[in-house]
Swiss-Prot record:
Pfam families: DSPc. InterPro entries: Dual-sp_phosphatase_cat-dom, mRNA_Capping_Enz/RNA_Phosphat, Prot-tyrosine_phosphatase-like, Tyr_Pase_AS, Tyr_Pase_dom, TYR_PHOSPHATASE_DUAL_dom. It comes from the Eukaryota. This is RNA/RNP complex-1-interacting phosphatase. Residues 1-11, 233-245 have a biased composition (Basic residues). Disulfide bonds: none annotated. It comes from Mus musculus. It is an enzyme of class 3 (hydrolase).
Length: 321
């Protein structure tokens, strides 16, 4: 008799068990290593930045100890304990399962920039981040509200883009920017490719690049305008290099591309009133895109406008990419 018959019945039961497919994680599973990081860092002196890990909505709390919970409400409480006020959240995660925009107070601006983990953010992602920060600072120069940035752990993607901004725009030395971020976050940037890129990459002046860069922005609306949309999930595999969401403008736009024609209706100028319309294509496949307050696109040759008075933009960008 085959030795496997006696213990496992007919067939090689032990071998079959070894080949069984891994159990799929549910949508409510806690991000890997999420518990290992401090929820919120400290404000970075001389800047408006504060970094934190992604807050998790209530449905995740069943899998956490009470002291491990970190919800959007906990985020604001912890920042208030530092006698600071949050004005903008830049979400760099490549999913929307962790919390909903409705979990945030209406007074908080929110921008989603889909950013793939582990790899160096591309120029489009960096450009979107810089634009979002500069626009917020311009509109909030008379207050001291903070820009909160998070990825999953609030460390690698978050640290890279904050440091990239400080190096390229503020002129900070790479090592100083990295040290400042690490000390304020309470954890050090872990990914060596991020650190090496920050240390070695030359700062580039964006002179004479108005055509490829401003074409993507001159018809776009305020990146911090509060907008709800009605996106529904689409079960399609995302493009390999897809980055960022799409900004819903405050005027009527017609936008068509070869892959995804859509239109955007005119939004109310009253930020407390939201209208629903057809919406841009979603981000990563299999996620819920029904709750989104801001959409951002800084890609060239994407927006075309009808009956829209374009805002002023300089002929070339003086700040760095």
């Amino acid at each position: 008799m085959n030795q496997h018959y006696g213990r496992h019945g007919r067939g090689r039961g032990r071998d079959f068990a070894a080949c069984a497919p891994p159990k799929k994680k549910g949508r409510n599973h806690i991000p890997e290593r999420w518990k290992d990081y401090l929820p919120v860092g400290q404000r970075m002196p001389g800047t408006r930045f504060i970094a934190f890990k992604v807050p998790l909505q209530k449905k995740f709390e069943a899998k956490l100890m009470p002291e491990e919970c970190f919800s959007p409400l906990d985020l604001f409480n912890k920042i208030q304990e530092q006698n600071e006020e949050l004005g903008l959240i830049i979400d760099l995660t490549y999913t929307q399962r962790y919390y909903k925009v409705e979990d945030l107070p209406e007074t908080i601006s929110y921008i989603k920039i889909f950013t793939v983990g582990h790899q160096i953010p591309d120029n489009d992602t960096i450009f979107q981040f810089k634009c979002a920060v500069k626009e917020f600072l311009k509109k909030n120069k008379n207050n001291d509200k903070l820009i909160g940035v998070h990825c999953t752990h609030g460390l690698n993607r978050t640290g890279y883009l904050i440091c990239r901004y400080l190096i390229d725009v503020e002129g900070m030395r790479p090592d100083d920017a990295i040290e400042l971020f690490n000390s304020c976050r309470g954890h050090c940037i872990e990914r060596q490719n991020y650190i090496e890129n920050l240390q070695k990459r030359h700062v580039r002046k964006n002179r004479n690049v108005s055509a490829p860069r401003t074409d993507g922005l001159e018809d776009s609306a305020d990146p911090t305008e509060q907008v709800y949309t009605n996106n529904k999930p689409v079960k399609k595999k995302p493009r390999k290099n897809r980055r960022g969401g799409h900004l819903a403008p405050s005027q009527h736009f017609q936008h068509q591309t070869q892959s995804s024609p859509y239109s955007l209706r005119k939004w109310s100028q009253n930020q407390s009133v939201y209208q629903r319309g057809l919406v841009p294509p979603p981000g990563p496949a299999g996620e819920d895109y029904s709750q989104r307050r801001f959409f951002w696109s800084a890609r060239p040759n994407k927006w075309t406008a009808e009956s829209y008075q374009r805002p002023f933009y300089p002929y070339y960008w003086e700040w760095n990419l």
